[in-house]
Amino acid sequence: MAKLLIVEARFYDHLNDLLLDGARTAIEDAGHKHETITVPGALEVPGAIAMAAESGRYDGFVALGVVIRGETYHFEVVSNESARGLMALSMDSLAIGNGILTVENEAQALTRARRTEKDKGGEAAKAALRMMELREKFAG
């Protein structure tokens, strides 16, 4: 049984609740354990995963959050840099599922977060689980 860490950037509670429900359900349905921590925003997710990875206590990671486009360039910075940070960590053989939604509006976020629709939280957890399998396969 593996243990995953869900790292959530909790900014929109109702949207994060949906993502978290999907991720937890996918992990539990696969027979694994999980813990959840909260960070201030999407930019802090990669750093938290890097710190947790150093502990050696987790087999995989699920990144969750919602970034909704506003009126400034901040959306692009947060979206691009959080994704870049997660990608850099994955290149170090960390099994990470990226469930940080980058959307134009709340309606898009709801569609992607609901388990009955796109279930991006569940998909991120399944991606992390699959990457864990691949890492184990290549390790021998």
Swiss-Prot record:
Binding, 5-amino-6-(D-ribitylamino)uracil: 11, 42-44, 66-68, 98
Catalytic activity entry: (2S)-2-hydroxy-3-oxobutyl phosphate + 5-amino-6-(D-ribitylamino)uracil = 6,7-dimethyl-8-(1-D-ribityl)lumazine + phosphate + 2 H2O + H(+)
The enzyme's E.C. designation: 2.5.1.78
Any GO molecular function: 6,7-dimethyl-8-ribityllumazine synthase activity
SS bond list: none
Top class in the EC scheme: transferase
A single BP term in Gene Ontology: riboflavin biosynthetic process
GO cellular component, one term: riboflavin synthase complex
Involved pathway(s): Cofactor biosynthesis; riboflavin biosynthesis; riboflavin from 2-hydroxy-3-oxobutyl phosphate and 5-amino-6-(D-ribitylamino)uracil: step 1/2
Keywords tagged on the record: Riboflavin biosynthesis, Transferase
InterPro entries: LS, LS/RS, LS/RS_sf
Tree of life domain: Bacteria
Pfam families tied to this protein: DMRL_synthase
Binding site for (2S)-2-hydroxy-3-oxobutyl phosphate: 71-72, 112
Gene3D superfamilies found in the cross-reference section: Lumazine/riboflavin synthase
Function: Catalyzes the formation of 6,7-dimethyl-8-ribityllumazine by condensation of 5-amino-6-(D-ribitylamino)uracil with 3,4-dihydroxy-2-butanone 4-phosphate. This is the penultimate step in the biosynthesis of riboflavin.
Similarity section: Belongs to the DMRL synthase family.
Annotated protein name in UniProt: 6,7-dimethyl-8-ribityllumazine synthase
Gene: ribH
